[in-house]
Amino acid sequence: MDLKFSNFFKEAEHPALVKKFDKSTTDESSSKEDYSTMSDLWKMFSKAKSELSNGRRVENLTWRLMSINLQKNLTPNGDSNTLTPDTFSDPTAPSSAQSVPPTSSAETTADNSDTEMKLNPIPAYSVPADTTGSSLMEFNYIQRRVRKTSFDESTAKSKKRSIADSHFPDPNAMQRPHDLESQPFSYPKIHASNSFNFVKRDIDSSNFSNLDASALPISPPSDFFSVHSHNLPNAPPSIPANSNNSASPNQRIKASPKHADTDVLGLDFDMTPSEPSSFPENGGFPSFVDANTHEQTLFPSSATNSFSFEHGSAGFPIPGSVPSTSYHANTASEDGFSSSYNSQGLFGISSPLSSGVTPNQSFFPDVSGNNIFDVSRNNHEVSSPLIQSPGSYVSMPSINMVSSLPISAPVPNSNSQFPRRPNTFRTNSSKSVGQGSSGVDSNQENAESFNPSISSHNSAEWASGETTGHSSNSPLPGSDMFSPQFMRVGTAMGVAPVRSNSSNNFGQNFFHQTSPQFSAVPHRKVSAQDTNLMGSSPGMYNHMPYLNRATSANSITSPGVLPEGMAASLKKRTTNTAATPQAALPTTLDTKKDRSVSFNINKNAEKPTVSNAAEDKKGDANTRRANATNPTPTCTNCQTRTTPLWRRSPDGQPLCNACGLFMKINGVVRPLSLKTDVIKKRNRGVGTSATPKQSGGRKGSTRKSSSKSSSAKSTAADMKPKADSKSISPGFVGGNQSLSSERIPLDPSMRSPLQQQSSENESKSQSMLSANNLNAGVNDFGLGFSEGLGSAHLDSNDSSMVQGKNDFAPVVDSPLFDAFDTDLGMSSVAESHTMNMDPSDLSRVSKSWDWYSVM
């Protein structure tokens, strides 16, 4: 400060300014007087701030000067962090050891005695150390006003306590008298050793008077997500035991706040969204309390703190967060409960966000070589998450990095004295996640190595819903109480129903859907040959649009398990989903070759023998199967591969633009004899939609009927269609268009184009008879009307044709009826008795709404 400015303050009227910059007054008595004068100066400006232009700024300046002067006075006492006195406090407050000596009346004059600020005593507990990071606040140095109540402010660091404050006991709780008014907050009775098994038995509220502060586990709020080892018997050497933050097991039995018996209901705590709720012990909800965890090793992870509940003296569970991160083999958390469950997620019906699982987490981690599950197992029975056994509780971790789903949740001990609660995941308990079970994201492909307790389920047993000891296989949550036919489960694409169908591996797949984190987890792409995952679980993954097509198509590989009416809808959904039916449908029913039915009409249809060698090769079964995987679609009626627009038949098969429009307009299948007429009339040219590349009979775009007809006559005699004595193929083979249409009933030995798995050992005499009947039914291109869907003639006015249709009208169990009339309760598409009908005669089942799906 320069000399001019110093002289200005020395010449000021107020003596406080003069003394402030007078270097002669530096002794201790003058410093005390400086404080008094600065207080008077601040009071003067605070009263006159309304009259001054910058009154607020001047008042703030004097306030700061007064506080600086006070801090200088308190520095020799070693209490530089003590706050400034409150000018509004009561002078008659009780004294304390840390109070600053008040200014004596001898050192003050009579003029300022009425306005002198007497320093009030500051209780030790009323001004706690600042741990909230508010030291940068402007008025942090101001002393908090001493309240006239006996409220202990050391228990409340702020108005809204943090999560750590609400979960850890006060280390000074035993040092203060047990006063109800001084203990407004009730702390959860938490013990860092997870030794709830003997704490619940031995703790007694009457012994609280014998406790001291050393018995309490002290955990600062900053250690909320850190790992503490608490002198457990089997604590690994890699985690050092912190003796400062732990107590011996004998001390920990008694370690509970002295005011524990005052919190009767256990409800006066801060519930955050990540905490589970507390429920009565014998109610319909579980009390998630860990048990038998003091005899196992710690779980070496810093992110798996488990919320636990301890029963107080009144018998009500009180929530808390245990800082110990022990992971034990004899608790239910070893059996896969390592994900973030809340009280709603345990019941299998939870929103995708309730568990906090990120999409990059695998909900079935690879357990081989994973230290997470490498824990020593003792021959103890593990209590189920919702069935309580004596002295046994379930540890539900709230924060972890490994999300897994339970495969087996063991049943409780037989001597359980508590009422049985509905088990969430009630399956056989012969195997657990830690013993090498596998899931969707595991690399084990053997179905039996997945989990024998699940893969060997008796479907009738789990469907009955009986819970008989170790054989209780009810997959639905609490299925002994309720078992809905459909459940609404949140998926990644929204809410979709889950069908409760019985199958061998159904319990495994149900866990993948009803768990909270299932909906947010992307799935590994399952091939159609993964029968251990998908083959025996019909309809499980059909409501999930994010699965691949082969998975949804493979869901009907076990037709015997499908209920009535469901197989048809599943088949229709699978057929409409597949973009190329030749690629998707042949693998759909590949596992059951004796019952296989493919809707690819031209897949196994026999071709006429022509001079082209490629056509002979296409007639081979292996080549046809390889051709089925060709991504290029083929018209199921005229066999063409080039068309300006692809359409679909009512059963979902691809049709060219001409055949699709003809079927949509006329309601019947377009005859192959009309193919050249349509092309000739419109003068399409080479490479049009009606070019039958597979027939090989037509070389150009224009029709030369004489040569084509003669070639067709010569090749028709060599055609030998496959025969099947079980097949009944009602239909009509029309003659050439120039001839009158006559009704020729097909021989029963003729093979329908849709029934593609034909037997090779039929007699050739029947084949020759069928070939003779087809001689009159060869079109201009050498292609018989049995090829494709050409059995229906265009001439709908022919009475003989209509009469023939009526002859076969009573036969109705056709796959086409299953694909549309699912309300009729038809049987499954893939069952053997549904293959006795030729569905190519679409006019027999046509309705007014059938052809809306052609587009």
UniProtKB/Swiss-Prot annotation:
Transmembrane segments: none annotated. CDD domains: ZnF_GATA. Disulfide bonds: none annotated. Pfam families: GATA, GATA_AreA. Residues 149-168, 614-623 have a biased composition (Basic and acidic residues). Keywords: Activator, DNA-binding, Metal-binding, Nucleus, Phosphoprotein, Transcription, Transcription regulation, Zinc, Zinc-finger. Gene3D superfamilies: Erythroid Transcription Factor GATA-1, subunit A. PROSITE patterns: GATA_ZN_FINGER_1, GATA_ZN_FINGER_2. The modification Phosphoserine is found at residues 150, 727, 729. Residues 72-112, 445-476 have a biased composition (Polar residues). Residues 72-126, 149-184, 229-287, 412-483, 602-643, 680-768 are annotated as: Disordered. One of its GO terms (biological process) is negative regulation of induction of conjugation with cellular fusion. InterPro entries: AreA_GATA, Transcription_factor_GATA, Znf_GATA, Znf_NHR/GATA. Residues 240-250, 428-444, 625-643, 707-717, 755-767 have a biased composition (Low complexity). A zinc finger (GATA-type) spans 635-659. The keyword Lyase does not apply. One of its GO terms (molecular function) is zinc ion binding. One of its GO terms (cellular component) is cell division site. PANTHER family: BOX A-BINDING FACTOR-RELATED (PTHR10071:SF281), TRANSCRIPTION FACTOR GATA FAMILY MEMBER (PTHR10071). This is Transcription factor gaf1. It comes from Schizosaccharomyces pombe (strain 972 / ATCC 24843). The lineage of its organism: Eukaryota, Fungi, Dikarya, Ascomycota, Taphrinomycotina.
